[in-house]
């Protein structure tokens, strides 16, 4: 018998009628009325669409339909009541996971952010003179001390730092850069596009794999405003290659009265090569080569908040501070608080390796990782019992964040093979958990890398896996 859509539609209860249901009255006591009402209307609209498309799926009685709607509203309200930005246990082994928020802040940085957010502060107030101050002065002395430069400026990310530098130094004029350095920095943002937005004109020189000093020299004209060096922090070209050194580029710039800028991308303040990582130039070394401006990120290898950090010659950086664009890309008090606290950790470089989570995760030894894996596997094995096979095996982690692209630090994974649940269902349940858990899937197993799992997350992670494997859905 063909169902009459109008008759089925009339079975749908009104909003006010639903709000008088006992379950929804309880929801109204726990959550804002506007949230519950919005959820009711959303679910009702979904049922209207179901009636039009598949009326046979609608429960036969008005009472059954109301019960189904109430259940869906309850689920919807609880989902909407959760913060959109949620905690995630990063079990991927990717230390600077861009999609999971990159660097985890140090304890001191967290306390500094809380202090700045919870109270008024001297963000732009000079406590000595009683007059207006500069927010950039809050980290200037630290950055000058740590990098050996004359001045600094902090903006909201490194792309903004590059944009501001190009806009200030080369708007309407030419910037020379090696063809092999025209990088894409993530999210489809590319150096040529950033340059176009700044108003500067790109002049490519050399080939993808080889660029010589003569290529730069031959491209210099009266329209040239800047020589740009972009460090390949997120990729490597190997084999038949040649790149002009910074010292050579600086000498050429001075010969022609042109400033030289280096975009480091990630930006190190400590050398990690002693831990087996490929050599990368530090900010100090880059600035020491004589370049006029260096730009780098705050939330990558520095281990701080998202920020674009500009250091260099005072005359050049001061020009950037006066650019109207600076106001549009400036940082807030919480970023500056976190950055200052992070930079202070670097006054004790050895201590920074332990206190800054990013550096601690990158420098952790194989013995420590193996012990962490053994403890986590023991907890999981005891909790999951015969519901899953738990094991350990050697593998590799990743640095992430567009940094150290060829590095593959060794690790020891904890593997989980569920017996009564597909991996697709398991990973979906873990993503829906609170906190969510994100690992990697290899060879039909869930793999958990202890490099990026904090010790105090072991019990939480074990409990989450216990719940999702023990609840039939």
UniProtKB/Swiss-Prot annotation:
It is found in: Cytoplasm. GO terms for molecular function: L-seryl-tRNA(Sec) selenium transferase activity. The keyword Cell wall biogenesis/degradation does not apply. Pathway: Aminoacyl-tRNA biosynthesis; selenocysteinyl-tRNA(Sec) biosynthesis; selenocysteinyl-tRNA(Sec) from L-seryl-tRNA(Sec) (bacterial route): step 1/1. InterPro entries: PyrdxlP-dep_Trfase, PyrdxlP-dep_Trfase_major, SelA-like, SelA_trans, SelA_trans_N_dom. Converts seryl-tRNA(Sec) to selenocysteinyl-tRNA(Sec) required for selenoprotein biosynthesis. This is L-seryl-tRNA(Sec) selenium transferase. It comes from Desulforudis audaxviator (strain MP104C). The gene is selA.
């Amino acid at each position: 018998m063909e169902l009459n859509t109008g008759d089925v539609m009339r079975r749908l209860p009104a909003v006010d009628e639903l709000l008088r249901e006992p379950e929804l009255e309880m929801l109204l006591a726990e959550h804002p009325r506007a949230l519950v009402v919005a959820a009711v209307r959303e679910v009702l609209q979904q049922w209207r669409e179901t009636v039009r498309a598949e009326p046979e799926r609608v429960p036969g009685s008005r009472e059954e339909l109301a019960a189904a709607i109430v259940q869906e509203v309850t689920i919807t309200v609880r989902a909407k009541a959760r913060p959109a930005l949620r905690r995630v246990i990063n079990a991927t082994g990717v230390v600077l996971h861009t999609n999971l928020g990159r660097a985890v802040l140090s304890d001191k940085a967290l306390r500094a952010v809380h202090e700045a957010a919870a109270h008024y502060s001297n963000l732009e107030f000079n406590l000595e003179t009683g007059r207006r101050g500069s927010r950039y002065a809050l980290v200037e002395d630290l950055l000058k001390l740590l990098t050996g430069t004359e001045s600094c400026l902090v903006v909201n990310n490194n792309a903004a730092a590059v944009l501001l530098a190009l806009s200030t130094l080369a708007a309407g004029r030419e910037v020379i850069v090696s063809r092999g350095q025209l990088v894409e920095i993530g999210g489809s943002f590319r150096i040529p596009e950033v340059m176009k937005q700044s108003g500067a004109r790109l002049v490519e020189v050399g080939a993808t794999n080889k660029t010589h000093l003569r290529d730069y020299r031959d491209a210099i004209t009266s329209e040239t405003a800047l020589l740009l060096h972009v460090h390949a922090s997120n990729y490597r070209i190997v084999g038949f290659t040649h790149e002009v050194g910074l010292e050579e580029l600086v000498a050429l710039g001075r010969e022609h009265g042109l400033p030289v800028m280096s975009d480091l991308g990630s930006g190190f303040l400590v050398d990690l090569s002693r831990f087996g990582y490929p050599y990368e130039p530090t900010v100090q070394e880059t600035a020491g080569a004589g370049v006029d401006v260096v730009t780098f990120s705050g939330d990558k290898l520095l281990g701080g908040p998202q920020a674009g950090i500009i250091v260099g010659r005072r005359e050049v950086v001061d020009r950037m501070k006066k650019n109207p664009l600076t106001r549009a890309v400036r940082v807030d008090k919480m970023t500056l608080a976190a950055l200052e606290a992070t930079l202070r950790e670097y006054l004790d470089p050895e201590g920074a390796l332990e206190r800054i989570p990013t550096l601690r995760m990158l420098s952790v030894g194989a013995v420590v990782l193996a012990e962490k894996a053994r403890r986590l596997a023991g907890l999981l094995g005891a909790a999951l019992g015969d519901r899953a096979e738990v094991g350990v095996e050697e593998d590799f982690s990743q640095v992430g964040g567009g940094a150290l692209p060829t590095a593959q630090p060794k690790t020891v994974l904890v593997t989980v093979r569920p017996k009564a649940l597909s991996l697709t269902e398991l990973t979906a349940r873990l993503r829906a958990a609170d906190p969510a858990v994100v690992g990697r899937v290899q060879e039909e197993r869930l793999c958990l890398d202890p490099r990026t799992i904090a010790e105090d997350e072991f019990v939480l992670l074990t409990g989450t896996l216990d719940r999702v494997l023990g609840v039939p859905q």
